[in-house]
């Protein structure tokens, strides 16, 4: 139970989020149509952030954790260009912090739209946490790819492969040698299925 981020951060969520929004977040992250952008992704991302807790003030860390909960709170593969903006709007609607401004939450969610590592340190750590799968083992990386394909199963395979390869090519050079090996291997895999 303690591995569940909603359990680990229940007090943080209760402090800053409208009570009726927490079950909505839970439902969204557990939507059965989400094969990759689900609770496992959220948990992996938060664990990456927790490894860096000592690098942040309490306020920064809390904002990054909230941003993790909200960065894919709204996720629709049929309209992927609007997901981050809708997630930010959702956060703004349900945020109840009275005395603190949580601009870092918006900025962190916003930075996940782009295939460029941001330079401000908190945003860089957040972006890296969201994209940590690029550096995972090949088996894990392929498992993530298969999950993403399930989310886009409505797209014909040839169209999916073309768009996915274009996306992957934009990521070469962003994640070091391990990431590049995975990306190139996945491109080859997609070209041959």
What would you call each of these model-derived segments?
Residues 21, 57-63, 97-111:
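Acidic/histidine metal-binding catalytic segments
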Residues 12-28, 41:
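Short alpha-helical hairpin
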Residues 79-82, 141:
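Cytochrome P450 core scaffold surrounding the K-helix E-X-X-R motif
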Residues 45, 61-77, 87, 106-113:
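His-Asp-centered metal-binding catalytic motifs of divalent-metal-dependent phosphohydrolases/nucleases
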Residues 18-24, 36, 81-84, 99:
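Short catalytic/metal-binding and nucleic-acid-binding patches
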Residues 45-46, 82-97:
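An active-site-proximal "capping" alpha-helix that borders the catalytic cofactor pocket
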Residues 56, 76-80, 98, 116:
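Amphipathic alpha-helical interaction segments
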Residues 3-12, 30-37, 47-58, 62, ...:
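Divalent metal-dependent phosphate-bond-processing catalytic cores, especially two-metal-ion Mg2+/Mn2+ enzymes
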């Amino acid at each position: 139970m303690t591995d569940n981020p909603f359990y680990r951060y229940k007090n943080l969520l209760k402090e800053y989020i409208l009570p009726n929004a927490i079950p909505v977040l839970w439902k969204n992250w557990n939507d059965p149509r989400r094969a990759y952008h689900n609770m496992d992704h959220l948990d992996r991302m938060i664990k990456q952030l927790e490894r860096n807790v000592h690098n942040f003030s309490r306020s920064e860390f809390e904002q990054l954790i909230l941003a993790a909960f909200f960065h894919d709170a709204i996720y629709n593969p049929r309209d992927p260009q609007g997901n981050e903006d809708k997630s930010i709007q959702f956060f703004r609607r349900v945020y109840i912090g009275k005395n603190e401004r949580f601009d870092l939450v918006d900025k962190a969610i916003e930075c996940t739209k782009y295939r460029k590592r941001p330079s401000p340190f908190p945003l860089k750590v957040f972006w890296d946490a969201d994209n940590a799968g690029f550096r995972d083992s090949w088996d894990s990386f392929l498992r993530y790819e298969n999950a993403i394909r399930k989310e886009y199963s409505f797209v014909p395979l040839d169209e999916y492969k073309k768009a996915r390869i274009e996306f992957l090519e934009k990521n070469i050079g962003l994640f070091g040698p391990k990431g590049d090996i995975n990306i190139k291997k996945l491109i080859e895999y997609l070209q041959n299925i």
